[in-house]
């Protein structure tokens, strides 16, 4: 396996190998993206974007199984330095199903759409007072993001009141970053899993 930075010279090969269909944005912005592909047997099978302390990953429409997933993440864990362990954010449900059987989940991003709305404004830091707690969240034209994971909040009653608070304050959409144990309860409130962050060690 080897890592290649995606650029105008290899983007068409990458699109073909990964069986991508919606590619205009990728082609138009390839030189602005900090995206890398992984090649196995001279074919792209995977890509990732590095962030400060994790990578966001994609397998495109390439056929995968648990053997390939383990091989790729073992390779990356040995070749990328993230203080001893690799954190990987996964967005695709099929890949999530495989990852759930292989790795430990650190946190989960969930979302609920209330109504359509514009979210192209800057975020404002705000606080919700729930059960004697001041809970930080960010509001961008009524599109809400609240990191329950970083605030160590997993009490179902607090989460339910917070959800109600956001809806009553005309939220268009609500995004939470949650601890893994909260997923089932969040789904009962109508939230869907957007991504999971896994610990590769």
Walk through the language-model features, giving the residues of each.
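Conserved donor-binding loop and adjoining core beta-sheet/short helix segment
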Residues: 28-71, 129-154
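Active-site/acyl-donor-binding loops of N-acyltransferases
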Residues: 89-119, 175-201
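Flexible, charged surface loops at secondary-structure boundaries
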Residues: 29-32, 78-82, 122, 138-140, ...
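Short amphipathic alpha-helix that is part of the acyltransferase structural core
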Residues: 1-25, 111-132, 142-143
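Conserved GNAT acetyl-CoA-binding A-motif
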Residues: 79-91, 168-178
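Residue-level detection of beta-strand scaffold positions
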Residues: 6, 11-14, 43-45, 68, ...
